[in-house]
Amino acid sequence: MENKINFSPPSTREGKGVRFLLTTFSILLCSLQAVAQSLPRVAPEQVGMDSHRLLHADEAIHRAIDHKEIPGAVLAVIRHGKMAYLKAYGNKRIYPNVEPMEINTVFDMASCSKSMSTAVSVMILVERGQLRLLDRVSFYLPDFQEWRGENGEKKDIRIIDLMTHTSGLPPYAPVSELQEKYGSPNPKGLMEYISTCKREFKPQTKFQYSCLNYITLQHIIETITGQSLRDFAKENIFDILGMQYTDYLPTIQQQDGKWINTVACPWMDRIAPTEKQKDGSVLCGQVHDPLARILKGGISVN
C-alpha cells in the first residue's frame, strides 16, 4: 500500500454523476439523530404528503414486528428538506434483556456498504483521474486472472464489471476452508483466492450478485490510495457529510492517530445488535457476515 498510482484524468463522461452520488448518499445516510436536529419538523401535508397514507407504513412495520420478522425499526420520511415523519418502533435489543428502539439507534449497514462506501470511493477516484471504469482489474492487481473459455478465449474483467456484478466471480467464498488455510483474519489470503478462483461465466454476459466483486474493488482502492478503505471513506465521505456515527468498527481514535477497537466506544450503547451466535453471545458493533468478520477483520465491503 505504500505506492500511490496516478493516471491521466478520465473523460468528462466518466466523471459525470459523482457529485450527484455524493449528494444522494448525504441525504440517505446521515444519522437520523443529526437529521432530526437539523431539519425542520412539519406536518406531512405541508410537504404534499398524506398523513393517512403514512399510516400504511406504520401498519407494515407493526405487522412485521408482530410476526417476529424484525424486533424493531426507525422510520424517517424527508421531503423538500423537511422532516415529515420520524418514529421508532419496537425494540433495539431483545436478548439477553429488552431495550426499546430509539430514533438515534445505529444500525449495521450490511451490504449497503457496497454502494455507500465502496462505489462512492471508486467514483471519487474516477473524478480525480486516478482510475477509469473501463480499466482491467489486473492493471491494479497484477495477480488477478482474466476469464478463460474452454476454447482458449480470454476476456479481461474490468472495474465496471465488478461494480455491476457482471464479472463472473462466484457469489461468495468458502470461509472455513480459507480460515484453515490462511488463518484469521487474512485479507491477503482472501484476495489470493479471489484472484485465482474459477470465473463462473464470461464477463458482461450475465448478472450475478457477488460479494467478491466489491472486496476486489476495496483492494483496488487501497492499492491506489495507499490507505485502508476505512480511512479513505472516513476522510472523503463520512467526515465531509457529517456522518460522525458511521464506521466499519465502533472505535475511538487515539491522539497518535491509531484506532483502538473497544466496547468503550462513546456511541456503543446506541448500536443495535445483529445476530445471536451458537455460543449464546450476541454480535453488537461487529459485522455479522462471516467473510467480513473472520477473514477481513470487520473492515470489508461485502
Locate predicted features:
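Bacterial N-terminal signal peptides
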Residues: 22-33
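Short, glycine/proline-biased beta-turn/loop segments that scaffold the active-site neighborhood
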Residues: 133-149, 239-241
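Short, surface-exposed loop or secondary-structure junction motifs
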Residues: 149-302
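Active-site SXXK
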Residues: 55-61, 75, 81-83, 108-134, ...
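Glycine-biased, low-complexity coil/linker segments
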Residues: 13-15
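Short, conserved catalytic-motif segment at the N-terminal edge
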Residues: 42-107, 195-196
